[in-house]
Amino acid sequence: MAAISMKQLLEAGVHFGHQTRRWNPKMKKYIFTERNGIYIIDLQKTVKKVDEAYNYVKEIASNGGTILFVGTKKQAQDSVRDEAIRSGMYFVNQRWLGGTLTNFQTIRKRINRLKSIEKMEEDGTFEVLPKKEVVNLLKEKERLVKFLGGIKEMNKLPDALFVIDPRKERIAIAEAHKLNIPIIGIVDTNCDPDEIDYVIPANDDAIRAVKLLTSKMADAILEVKQGEETEVVEEEANEAVAEEEAAEEVSTQE
């Protein structure tokens, strides 16, 4: 069964592309038709591409890998944060800081600074510091949380990026390319699909469309995680049954 239905895509407005004058000819193969000066995306191809991306995300999750969700445009910020948190992954939904991937060790230093301020706040250090210093530290913390909060626990480079709007996130994409990190992306009719390893041709401007597709990637991760949890429970149950049977056998022999 497909990971997503044509009905879901239509209801979310995934098929609406950009104006015909703002297009990338490389997206031609994903365009169904043109209507009132707007390109209509071929949703049959979107269904197929969502399936490919879904299976790839499941593969990463099965191997214990991590995915960094990236979407800094207004329409994507909430979905990127919510779905990354729901699936236990990482996210960047404010400005992409140059070097987030290519200069990861420096970024880690900023994250350690954030953790250090949070520790000071928790262990009572703030209570003995001058009020002005505390105010400055809280401002610094707020700024660090805004830009780095979503990757605070990311201790190594991600195994893949999930990106909304490659044009908007071109710095993130360039960094991923440099490090050979695969990219899954929601790609509208004005983008270059060649930059993306797993293209999802779709409207990247409608909040509902972005939410639907982002939630599907999170679902793929959770499908794997919940499957693993079920396996652990079954293993524990089987072990308990085996122990009971062994105990019964011993008591029978006695």
Swiss-Prot record:
Highest taxon of the lineage: Bacteria
InterPro entries recorded: Ribosomal_uS2 (IPR001865), Ribosomal_uS2_bac/mit/plastid (IPR005706), Ribosomal_uS2_CS (IPR018130), Ribosomal_uS2_flav_dom_sf (IPR023591)
Native source organism of the sequence: Oceanobacillus iheyensis (strain DSM 14371 / CIP 107618 / JCM 11309 / KCTC 3954 / HTE831)
Entry-linked PROSITE patterns: RIBOSOMAL_S2_1 (PS00962), RIBOSOMAL_S2_2 (PS00963)
Gene field: rpsB
Annotated SUPFAM superfamilies: Ribosomal protein S2
The protein, known as: Small ribosomal subunit protein uS2
Entries under Pfam families matching the protein: Ribosomal_S2
A Gene Ontology cellular-component term: cytosolic small ribosomal subunit
Membership in a protein family: Belongs to the universal ribosomal protein uS2 family.
GO molecular function, one term: structural constituent of ribosome
